[in-house]
């Protein structure tokens, strides 16, 4: 399974995951199992974030964990769930951006809490 494209779309990513599952993974885990795995993977991202950007220090065996790799594990399971439930993430993402834009186009610009550094100058 070779991916020659430099830029991978969400649709390509969904297809790549599906091909990988069918070639190497035998079949998808159940949706509920994948939801539990997603929760586990998000926890691994949280662990890195808490140690890298928060107040906790790394445990010796966690020092070399890659945030990018853990984020990709989250993305992988999201892509699996989308494939299993028939969600085209590319279309859903476009619709979601439009929804957010319509709902929030002025909300954040008018939020004085987000401009606190400007008022301190």
What are the residue ranges of the model-derived segments?
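Flexible "arm" and connector segments at domain edges
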Residues: 1-71, 75-121
């Amino acid at each position: 399974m070779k991916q020659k494209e430099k830029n991978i779309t969400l649709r390509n990513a969904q297809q790549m995951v599906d091909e990988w599952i069918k070639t190497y993974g035998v079949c998808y885990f159940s949706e509920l199992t994948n939801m539990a795995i997603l929760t586990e993977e998000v926890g691994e991202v949280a662990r890195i974030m808490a140690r890298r950007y928060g107040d906790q220090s790394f445990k010796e065996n966690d020092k070399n964990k890659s945030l990018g790799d853990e984020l990709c594990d989250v993305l992988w399971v999201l892509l699996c769930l989308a494939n299993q439930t028939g969600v085209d993430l590319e279309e859903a993402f476009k619709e979601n951006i439009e929804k957010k834009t319509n709902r929030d186009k002025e909300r954040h610009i008018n939020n004085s809490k987000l401009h606190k550094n400007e008022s301190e100058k």
